[in-house]
Amino acid sequence: GMPTGRSWELDWDDLEALRKLPRIEYISAICWGNQRNMSHQDHKGEFGLMGYSPDMQQIAPQQILMGRYLNEVDELRQRKVCVIGLQVWRDLFPGGEDPTGKTIQIGSSYFTVVGVTKPLGGMMAFSDPERTVVIPALLVQQMYGLGRTIDMLALTGYADEPTQEVIQDCRQSIAARHLIAPDDKKAIYFQ
């Protein structure tokens, strides 16, 4: 077998392989951009930056207050667009104006705001959704030199599919791709 303690990383090919599984309904990459300084005109703040795929809105829905969520075209064309959380909007646009179509600076890059969201409950991948800016996952990978690696995947199976079977299909696919024993519960973790 393989040596114990060997490390491996999820990547975009894993996402594409799992997307093809018949039990999977929605799947999203999750790429952490960490805390970043952001600004709009004279208004500044430090907020969480997350990279998601458009399916994330189906997996962990947010209420869309203005504009829209990320879509497939944003991802395919790697558009520099973002969806901002409610508190980000309040801090960077204190006048309360509609920010859609306006630009915010994230580090040295500029992004066009396409939507404002607030949580419908539940959590969003280890960040406070109201203080988070979401951009296409591929852009987080590019901006921070992550190559094709993905921090996590979020996915849902079809409603009539037993959860354990969805997990088993995913585990087998990833284990085969990364030469991991299919029964290694520590190497591939589901929650």
Language model: regions and residue ranges:
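Peri-transmembrane interface segments
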Residues: 182-191
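Residue-level detector of beta-strand face positions
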Residues: 37, 101-105, 189
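Mid-to-C-terminal secondary-structure elements
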Residues: 50, 54-74, 78-183
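Structured loop/turn residues at beta-strand edges in well-structured enzyme cores
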Residues: 22-25, 148, 186
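Short loop/turn motifs enriched for small/polar and acidic residues
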Residues: 32, 116, 191
